[in-house]
Amino acid sequence: MGQQTSLYQKHLDAGAKIVDFAGWDMPINYGSLIEEHNQVRTAAGVFDVSHMAVVDVGGKDAGKYLRYLLANDVAKLDEVGRALYSAMLNHDGHVLDDLIVYRMSFGYRLVVNCATRGKDLRWMIQNTDGYAVSIQERPRLAILAVHGPESINKVCEVVEEDQTNQIRGLKYFHGVELERFFIARTGYTGEKGVEFIFPDSDASELWDKLLAAGVKPIGIGARDTLRLEAGMNLYGHDMDETTSPLAANMEFTIAYEPEDREFIGKPALIAHKQLRDAGKLPELVGLVLESRGVLREGQKLVTDKGEGIITSGSFSPTLKHSIALARIPINSQSCEVDLRGTITTVRIVKPNFVRFGKKVFE
C-alpha cells in the first residue's frame, strides 16, 4: 500500500479505480476516462492533486536564493499572489524538475512533483549555503484543482459570498490568500480554472461541496490526456535530469536577463544554445496521427534528419485521433513511426494541440 491523500476514502466512495502513482494510491478514473476528459473540456471537474509536494521558502534571503536556484527569475513576482513556472536545473543545465512558485505574504511557495520530492528537497537544502533562508515542506496541505469552462462559476457557488469577486477577478497565474485557502488561477489542463491549496483537514468538506454543486471527480488518467492535448510536459517522460530544457520546449521557463544574474545551470545552457544553433540538439515537437492507430511513449521515429522517440502519446478525446510529444532532430520536416509493422507517416506540429476546448495547431 502506498501513501494516501486525505481524500482516499472519498475516492473509493465515488467508485475510483486506484493505481500506484510514484508511491501514492491515486484514482486513475471513476468510470470512463473519456467521459471525465470531456467533462473538463465542456463543464467542470475536480482533481485531487494533494500528492504533489508543497515547499515554503522564507527568510530575508528567500528571493535572492530562489533567483540562484531557479532558471526563471522570481524577481518577476513583484506582488503577493503572482505565480511563475520554472525549471530547476542541475549544474549540467539539465532539468531536475519543473515547478510553480508563488509569491506569498511570508515569502514564496513552491509546488513540485511528487516523484521528485526527495530529490528536490535535498537539492534545495544543498544549495542554501550563504543564504539566510528557511525551507519547510508542508505535507498537511491539500491541493484541489477545479478546471473547465464552468469551473469559476462552480467554485463561486461553494465559497463565501464575499470571496467571489476576488476569485472572479484573478488573472491567469495569479493567486489570492483567502483565510485558510490559497486560490490560484493555475493548472495543468489547458482550460480555465483554479487550484486550492489549504489544510487537508478541510479537504473532505470542500470536496463534498464541489460535488454537490455538480463538479465531477476526475482521475489522473484524464489529467494526463488533458495535459497532453495542452502540450504540457510530464516530468520523467518528456524531460528529466538528462534533458536540456532547450530540448524539452522549456526555454520560456528560463530568464537569461538580466545578464548579471547567475543561476544554477546557466553556463551549461549557453553551451546547449551553441549545440542547438549547430543543429546538434534535438527538439520536442508535437505529432499528429490522423489515420488509425495510437502513438505511445517509447515508440521510435525516423525523420529526414535522423531518429527520434515519442515521450508521451495517447488518443485525443477532443480531436478524435492520436497525438504525441516527441524528441526528434531539430528542423526535421518529415516523420514516420512503425505501428505494428506498418510504417506510418505522422505530421510534425508545434507541441500544443488544444486550448479551451479548441484545436490550435494547423
Label each PLM-derived region with a short phrase.
Residues 1-22, 27-28, 104-362:
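Conserved, structured C-terminal
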Residues 1-89, 94:
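Acidic, proline/glycine-enriched N-terminal capping motif
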Residues 36-40, 91, 98, 177-184:
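Membrane-targeting and insertion segments and their boundary/processing signals
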Residues 51, 61-66, 84, 95-97, ...:
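Generic hydrophobic, aliphatic-rich segments that mediate packing or membrane embedding
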Residues 76-79, 87-94, 99-104, 126-127, ...:
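Short, charge-rich binding segments
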